[in-house]
Amino acid sequence: QMRGSRSKALAERALVNCRYSLAAFSTGERRRRPPHGDRQCAELALHLQQSFEAAILTHLYPRSQIDIYVQILQADGGNYCAGVNAATLAVMDAGIPMRDYVCASTAGLAEETPLADLSAPEEAAGGPRLVLALLPATGQIALLQLSARLHQERLEAALEAAGQACRALHAVLDRGVRERLREVT
């Protein structure tokens, strides 16, 4: 909780501003969307902001604003997670210092079997869906969201599946960042 004025807080650290939206052609539905998304997009933008505020070293950029805009071009499952992972690479490529990568994955259950990185049909099946954004080096959870009630044992299994997916993704992202760094230097 921030105490004092907003301007004082911005004088001490950077403001992370996020926008999340779906392109009009990204889904099969043909309903008209507002230009900057709907209520769900606003909620996901807030989650994105909270996830990156946990990772970006905002104190190094007082009186600054870091904008992260995510637009999903093809909504085929795990949209928010794909946006988080892409934004992580973009922030790193921009040279903004971070405590750790922010890696995100979904998880769910298919007949008691935990699944990670759900596709659109798996998400649409209606079972409980878990979204995990993780800082893998520290194990800190930046975001944990569950779409339905779930028994504790099943929750632990789904959380473990999402955590393993995030750690595997971290290895892939880290390898890509290191290759990019070799190209640049």
Indicate residue ranges for each PLM-predicted region:
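Polyanion-binding surfaces on beta-sheet-dominated domains and ring/shell assemblies
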Residues: 1-185
